[in-house]
Amino acid sequence: MLMEERIRRASGVMARHGAASRIFKIQGGDSAGDYLLMNLFNSFSAASSTFQKMSADPELAKLFMERALNPAGDITGPDIFRSVYGEPPEKPSPILIGRGYHVPRGKVKDMLAMAPELEALFKKVDSSIGVVMPVIAADHEMMYITYRFTSMDHMGSALDTMVENQDFQNLITKANELGTLKMSRMMSLM
């Protein structure tokens, strides 16, 4: 598929210039069927440096020229987020669930205070979590929680356990008192 081939090429350019570049296919939920190209950096300085280098890369210029002549999809973003809890693993997780909450700025501290308890619950099912917030994006009152799984089977088993777990249900209730769940999605690593 032309779009997948182009995304992989773009990701390769970004990785050559220092990004930990990952491509996900959104399998269900918000934006199902779309692709998500994600680049991770250790600092904003590293991200800025990579952005400048990749923007000057002839391969990326060629790719955008090909796209202009024969579009194969729409590009949105880039948005920039910062990790506020739970560092992403060096090896990307094959399956992710992302949940986006609208959280007024005055309630961010209380929402983040629940992250260690959420992490402890998911460690019991051999999963990890991460929380990011926007630095440059359309909505600065969003908080995204990512649940990481080793496989589709692992995700199913973990979710079976969590939906029956009263401590998890209590956390979800509290989260919905502090913010409003606006979106959720399931993604697979390409």
List PLM regions with ranges.
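Short S/T/G/P-rich N-terminal loop/turn motif that feeds into the first structured element of a domain
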Residues: 1-190
